Amino acid sequence: LAGAISLKDIPEVEYAALYNDLKERLKQDNYHVAHYFATPDGNNLRFYLILLDDAEHKVMVATFTMEYYDEVALPSLTALHPAMHVYEREIAELYNVEFDTMPWNKPLRFPFNRRNRNSTMDNYPFYTIEGDSLHEVNVGPIHAGIIEPGAFRFICKGENVLHLEIALGYQHRGVESEFTKTTNRLRQTLLAEAIAGDTA
């Protein structure tokens, strides 16, 4: 593929150096993270981060590893840059990686292959506010409409919405792992359209 990079050519860094570099870069508007994920690599967990520089039109990729069962908490990038929460929540959910100082580390999608099998919808950590004048309104995950199924939980005081919690991903059902089972571009396109909903 044009522009592809070999895995062996991706620079490997220490997490502390990556964290400190991102802490400064993400303060600038021209940088944003395109993807941040982890995957098993023997007895290790290998993390990949793809950073885009919109001003210079550059794609930067870095990787770091930690032992798969290492219980050392990583400093959370979400605490500094809230947009990182989806990436860190998915990594935490899939591999039980702890991110120190991460605000409200709730599960993202409950995939079938999640590491913490005790984490279920029955003990999902919904955000709560106590008060006699408050009420909750739950909508979904099945609702009339063409958008992706989702659960929406409103906490209201009269007609004012104080908090809205959105839970999406109900129709993914492990579709990401289906992509890895085929190299057929037509099959991959059909899978992508199947999860895209009204944006297909």
Go through the PLM ranges and name each one.
Residues 1-164:
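Terminal low-complexity/charged segments
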